[in-house]
Amino acid sequence: MLTGEGPIDFIHVAGASSSRAAAGSHNYGRIRLRHFVLCGLRWEASMPWYDTQGKLQALVPGQTSTVFPLSPSGLVFPGDAGVPKTLAPTRYNNFAPRIGLAYSPGFSDGALGKIFGGPGKTSIRAAFGIYYTSVEDLTLFYEVADAPFGLYWTSPVSVMMDEPFRIRATGASIGQRFPFTAPVPGAASNATLDFSVYEPFNFFPGYGTHNKLPYGEHFNLSIQRELSKSTVLTLAYVGTAGHQLITQQEANPGSAALCMNLNAANAYDTTSDTFGCGPGQENDVFNTVAAAPCGVAFNSNCVYGTRQSLNSPNFCQGATPQVCFGSGNTYTFTNANSIYNAGQITVERKANDFTFLAAYTFAKGLDNSSAFNDLVNFLNPKLSRGLSSSDIRHNFVASYIWAIPFDRAFKGAPKRLTQGWQVQGITRFATGFPIQMNQSDDDISLAGSGGTDMPDRVGPVKTVDPRKSNPGCFNPNTGGDTGCYFLPGAFAPNTVLGTFGTANRRFFHGPGFNNTDFGMLKRTVIHENYAFDLRIEFFNIFNHAQFKNPTGNIDDSNFGIVTSARDPRIGQISAKFYW
């Protein structure tokens, strides 16, 4: 229930809702006694999130708003041409077919009879399906309370602590922006709303106006064979292809070509009082003809930053410096994709005293974005393609429970002492997660965009035991040659201006898993309605050192160095009384 009071509704999470429509049909069919088919079709319509008061905005290069005519080109709002209240249209053509097949071989003689075990001993299954997902509400959270409906302003220069709108060096005012009154969508005064108070726009997200609904294609094939009355073996292939996945990319990157041209011309940087253009100068104003300020009005001899994608010439008269769109402006796009393929082997046994499940997976996952904030390369999304951040190539897990039959071994002993003993555990051996490579501090690409600059790969990657001495390893924390997981000599900082580096951002794995959790339980039945449990548990019982991934940031002094580990052995004792 809405109270009408914003803070109260926010605390109670009132007023947040979503709309989603779907319809489906399934048909079951048995072709023969041992053949079974399931077909289905689902229709999905999921509306993107929107603000009920229309207080949203989007970024569309070169488009001028009619809702707020004085806003800079590139900034648009619901009601502008091609911009619905949901920013992206609700699409109604999302049809998701699916089919499943099952077959139980009936061979009883010959080689096939031995392979399949006879009638009713083996089941072969295959399936394919398309599944849509709704758009996560985090995408709307990124859009709300941005200009002109909220004010997030970053000073381009150092300011005084007590008066943060005054330049520390000169004492000159760059404009007091607070407090301010947010406009009301549809008000007549919006036609003359002054946007200079919001400029420059930094860390300003924009939801793609052509976004679609993410979906996945799922497919699998499995053979399940009964080995005995209590044991089943399963061999399976599992695959998933993700399409139109939500991700982010830089909306207004710096132009490397423009920066290098300014550098070749030895243009005067009016912001830093230097000559030439290089890393970190995407938001600076350059005078191409004289070593002089560009003035308050637009000057055709000046270049207003190298970020020209959203708005060219990217000039805003009220901004300081006079750049409309600065750093951290991103698109939320549905242009990511993924592929996952896995082979699986599972053995399961369920007996009176002993139960276990053992599974091994050999898999590979690739994508160009593993998460919402895993930025895609704005120039070419294929440059971001690599191992998924969750990729684990080899993964073996076994779980087991053994009810120890002391009562059968010591038949003359009291039942309360010999019954109720149980040991259980989970053992895992697995390769680690991929190491994320980057070169975060140098801005060699001249793009001013996080997550896209990479080091150069200059040799094969060699992984080593961080507990041992390794030539080629230098640990700045100890001054020794231990602690490396991979030797840094395989990489070098990229120094070629205007390029992204040659290393893939995720292409090899970090330290793996070697872990066993073990527990022992003794249940004592005191009376028909009373029982007492005593449980002893150990996590990582063998106390294996399981290192976490080192940093893959070549600008970090700990590049390739293991600095943390997962939990050591932890033991606990607990008791529980039942009545």
Feature roles, as predicted:
Residues 1-2, 100:
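Accessible peptide chain termini
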